[in-house]
Amino acid sequence: AASDVYKRQVNQEEWLQIIRNNIKAALAVNPEYLVWHVSNCNLKEIFTFDFFYNDAQVIDASIEVFNAVSECIPDNVIVLFENLWWPGLRLIEPGIVDRFFCGLKKQNVGIMLDTGHLMNTNISLSNELEAVSFICQTVENLGMYKNYIHGMHLSCSLSGSYQKHSCKAVPECCSMTEIMHHVTSIDQHLIFKESGLKSLIECIEPSYLVHELFYDNLAELSVLVQTQQKLLLK
């Protein structure tokens, strides 16, 4: 339904106004921070991995959009830009990260690091210890922008095997069920089960930590969160 609303906008200003309205709706609950995803991918590209736009192009367009609507965000509310594995702010190229933040007009900004999304960019990862090492090294490579990481969405996603063996073609029957199965097979939102999370937290030192996991009910979520929290101490 939300996508239909965007599609009905006939010009740029109407589209930007929808974004402003969404921001105002979020601000109504007095948040400490807002999260903004920086990525671009159409339905075909989700399956083929053959992307029309590269990181720099998506970054430049995102800068333009954000600067056009940022005036409605109070200075005391920080905007945390989240990484994805599709073209945009993937965090694996420090130059792209620098290009993005240098282009923003708003000063109170930072990064919401999604561990699963970052893991999805490296299809060679085979276990959790490799993943933690990769995440920490990627963060260190950001230089000064390491300090821009204020929050973390914590989950495990070792989807390299699935991505390697994906048929790279759009299914004939491309239903929402097919789409969601494919996307969630890549972005798995599982818990970490091995030790090593303590070193990850010490490396990043986030002010906000969200256990972003898939679950069927609140009872299951409670168990998953408790399990992952215990690993933070090991």
Spans of model-derived segments:
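Short, active-site-adjacent cap segments at secondary-structure transitions
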Residues: N42, L118-M119
